[in-house]
């Protein structure tokens, strides 16, 4: 049995131009809201692949850091810029020779003292 108050005041919905959620009913697929599920497996596979790739990259970085620590490629005390005090200490530790050791080196040398001076890029004739 119908409610008499509804039958007299409710408009007729038989019109074909019914609009639901701002869209014409005849233009939309009634399942358009759920169409994303059509490719759900492909989407999940793609996301899983991206997660595996991120994990792989993270492991690579971790291995690189461990290798760097193992080989001590980066030593902050050696590789970072030094303070002015450290540079001054190293400068003060340098010894200026009086030249006598240089003369000893020349006397004990096996080089030819009469040889022409080497100039890069200049070709000399056959000797």
UniProtKB/Swiss-Prot annotation:
Q: Which PANTHER family match?
A: POLYADENYLATE-BINDING PROTEIN-INTERACTING PROTEIN 2 (PTHR13154:SF2)
Q: Name one Pfam family in it.
A: PAM2
Q: Which residues form a coiled coil?
A: none
Q: How is this protein annotated for GO cellular component?
A: cytoplasm
Q: Please list where the region (Disordered) is annotated.
A: 1-24
Protein name in the entry: Polyadenylate-binding protein-interacting protein 2
Per the UniProt entry, what is one GO biological process? translation
> In which tissues or organs does this protein occur?
Expressed at highest level in testis, but also abundant in brain, cervix, lung, ovary, placenta, adipose tissue, thymus and thyroid.
